[in-house]
Curated annotation (Swiss-Prot):
The lineage of its organism: Bacteria, Bacillati, Bacillota, Clostridia, Eubacteriales. Residues 59-62 are annotated as: G3. Pfam families: KH_2 (PF07650), MMR_HSR1 (PF01926). Residues 4-171 form the Era-type G domain. NCBIfam families: era, PRK00089.1, small_GTP. Belongs to the TRAFAC class TrmE-Era-EngA-EngB-Septin-like GTPase superfamily. Era GTPase family. The keyword NADP does not apply. The keyword Acyltransferase does not apply. GO terms for cellular component: cytosol; plasma membrane. It comes from Ruminiclostridium cellulolyticum (strain ATCC 35319 / DSM 5812 / JCM 6584 / H10). Residues 121-124 are annotated as: G4. This is GTPase Era. One of its GO terms (molecular function) is GTP binding. Residues 202-279 form the KH type-2 domain. It is a peripheral membrane protein.
Amino acid sequence: MSYKSGFVSVIGRPNVGKSTLLNTITGQKIAIMSNKPQTTRNTIRGVITNKECQLILIDTPGIHKPKTKLGEYMVNVASETIKEVDLILFLVEANTQPGAQDVNIIQQLKQIKTPVFLILNKVDLISKDKLLAIIDSYSKLMDFKAIIPISALKNDGIDLILKEALDYIPEGPQFFSEDMLTDQPEKVIAAEMIREKVLLNLDDEVPHGVGVEVTSFKEREDGLINIQATIYCEKSSHKGIIIGKQGNMLKKIGSAARYEIERLLDTKIFLELWVKVKPDWRNSDNMLKTLGYKTNKN
């Protein structure tokens, strides 16, 4: 059989486990995770390479009704991505009937010719009878090329996705080297890991208004990497929460982020964090550009 290579998009509404699925398939944490919706803001590409094929999996932001320019950017990224891939994995929760957001995504999928797999995540949380009922509900909405129940967290059903995907991936060369797991620059990964720790440690109101910019990423002669990063928030009160009493929260965020970045880069780092207030930055084209989000004006 000839070698195959292609692009696979993982889409779905916010917080259904898209980043968990990407991390499980690649066997490495390359996408940040939290239980808060809209954690993923950019497309993140994970690379899987074996003797038969190379698959480039694209984790997209959750499709939702946007309230800011950042939200509009996230939805546009997800919507445009599905037009440029060889296969789409539509990820839903196995224990939930199709909702308005799911139906909206399906309407978009029906307008393109790209094959779509229905992937039902969190199958370990539901009985077989209820699962079959939910599968039936989705089957009435669209003709999926494959329907695969999985548990991304427990690595259950993942091999079946890869096996079935081969039938829809074209012949082609390797786009990336065999040892490459993601095309994300190290600077971007570092910023995302810092943002993840903010998401995990703070209340719901603050994280949605937080962006992270790595302002310096330099390797020293002794092999240590110096990283300087700024955490942007929209309110002075949020700045105080992020820093915490006597700086304890910022220290906690920095310590957790440093551990994660060191594990990913396989080297020691020195991490410095600052917190700055930028009111309404999620609606600022200049700030979105600074943080790496492409808008219609850049």
